[in-house]
Amino acid sequence: MILAVTGGKGGVGKSTVALNLAAELDAVLVDGDLAMADLPVGSGPDLHDVLAGRAAPFEAVQRLGEVLVLPCGRSLAGARAADPRALGGVLGDLAATHGDVVVDCAAGLKADVGVPLAAADACVLVTLPGVPAVADGVRARELAVRFGAGVAAVALNRSDGVALEPVERALGGRAVALPESRALAAAVRDGRPARTVEAGTAAVEAVRELGRVVQSCKSA
């Protein structure tokens, strides 16, 4: 299964959700933001190299703690050399080899978001509480559906005690509230899923529930 993690704008915690969800699903995590990568980068080849034909996908997959990651480079030259049209084939190859793949998409409604969405079987929408953020999520959902990536789940980030039903109606998917958590917030910076730092906390249990919702969609 190829799962795209997307959102209507930056700053909603999309990369945080992607990293922690990949750990929960035992999936390969791909940083699909070719221009503004967020996930930690190792010392080997990266997605820019793969999309430029300089490396095979399996050569660029690295272990980041307990998660396998295909990171993306951060150089302008690398981004220019990469062919985004090849991304779908790369994701398909990873899924054939490893099973589940989680793609951290570029933020917002940029044109390059469409490539991983077109390759994905489903998506997780990440949003924040509040009407403006959910409205951005609606636009992200419309884009995902246009490319054939149905909504597997909605991650309502940095929320606790918020009514989920209005969000579910607006975004067309089962919503899971992820409460504020220092371990979640630091996951991308430290390259460590929250469950390795705060096992058993409300935030970790919420990520586990998000994983269950995605798995139920996969088996439906």
Task: Please provide the spans of the model-predicted regions.
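Short, structured coil segments at secondary-structure junctions
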Residues: 43, 65, 119-120, 147, ...
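Phosphate-binding/switch loop-helix module in NTP-utilizing enzymes
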Residues: 72-112
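G-domain G4 guanine-recognition motif of GTPases
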Residues: 8-9, 128-129, 152-164, 178-184
